[in-house]
Amino acid sequence: MGHSATDLNETRILLYYCFTPIDDPTAVMLWQRALCEQLELKGRILISKHGINGTVGGSLASCKQYVRRTREFPGFKKMEFKWSAGSADDFPRLSVKVREEIVAFGAPDELKVDENGVIGGGVHLKPEEVNKLVEERGDEVVFFDGRNAMEAEIGKFKNAIVPDVRTTHDFISEIESGKYDDLKDKPVVTYCTGGIRCEILSSLMKNRGFEEVYQIDGGIVRYGEKYGDKGLWEGSLYVFDGRMHMEFSDDAATLGRCRACGHATNDFHNCVNEQCREQILLCEECAADPESATCGRKECAEVAAEMVG
């Protein structure tokens, strides 16, 4: 089948996941790697016995073919793909790996999946159902950020609780800490970029006594596509590729503040210390000055001072 000039010239990024039992993750990994290489796609794909989690970029024609051929695998037949602007150039390389978990919560044996997805997860809400829940229950509804705390610095749901986590691995100890026990009888709406982290987080929360847990179908991406900046979402969305962040309209608020001077910015930069490289919010001016372009740790400040000296 031929491709139109548009399909060959235009590029896209695909974001997708599917929880389904996979008997032979290594075989699926080899198939996916060969498929992406053939279609000249770049990105990152993780496969485990629980399913697949991926983001890839390339020509529109290749992305369309990738979707069609990936859905030929029985467990992936109904998998949803989210399309966004971008290309293979937004990724350094193609990485396809088998892992114990497709999201590293540190609970591979607690997670249970069947052909319908995660067993015992939170109730799925479509974007309009999220707004309806808030209309009906008001301030009783709590938005619970299922991402790393850093991501929420540039965008989050209005009045959301942002747990103190640096990585997904920190979530279990955080929700077991007792800090959020007062939420156990409230409607809690978990949210994350595309929905995958909340599939797992919502089930972990329910297993720990949170009674009324929800998750947003398609995550922030789906909600933002529907409501832009006229709904309950505020600011920019952090993304894990060369774009670093995306906005749903030209009216997006700039929530982030430069770590050094406090000016409004949504741009993350790596700490100037090559051994650290922690991502920090910096305006362009402070990012260009080694003395201000550090995460604040003593050893990083010393490296910066040497660079200036």
UniProtKB/Swiss-Prot annotation:
One of its GO terms (molecular function) is oxidoreductase activity, acting on paired donors, with incorporation or reduction of molecular oxygen. The active site is at C192 (cysteine persulfide intermediate). SUPFAM superfamilies: Rhodanese/Cell cycle control phosphatase (SSF52821). It holds the Pfam family UPF0176_N. CDD domains: RHOD_YceA. Its EC number is 1.14.-.-. Keywords: Oxidoreductase, tRNA processing. GO terms for biological process: tRNA modification. It catalyses: uridine(34) in tRNA + AH2 + O2 = 5-hydroxyuridine(34) in tRNA + A + H2O. Residues 137-232 form the Rhodanese domain. The keyword Oxidoreductase applies. Catalyzes oxygen-dependent 5-hydroxyuridine (ho5U) modification at position 34 in tRNAs. Belongs to the TrhO family. This is tRNA uridine(34) hydroxylase. It comes from Corynebacterium jeikeium (strain K411). The gene is trhO.
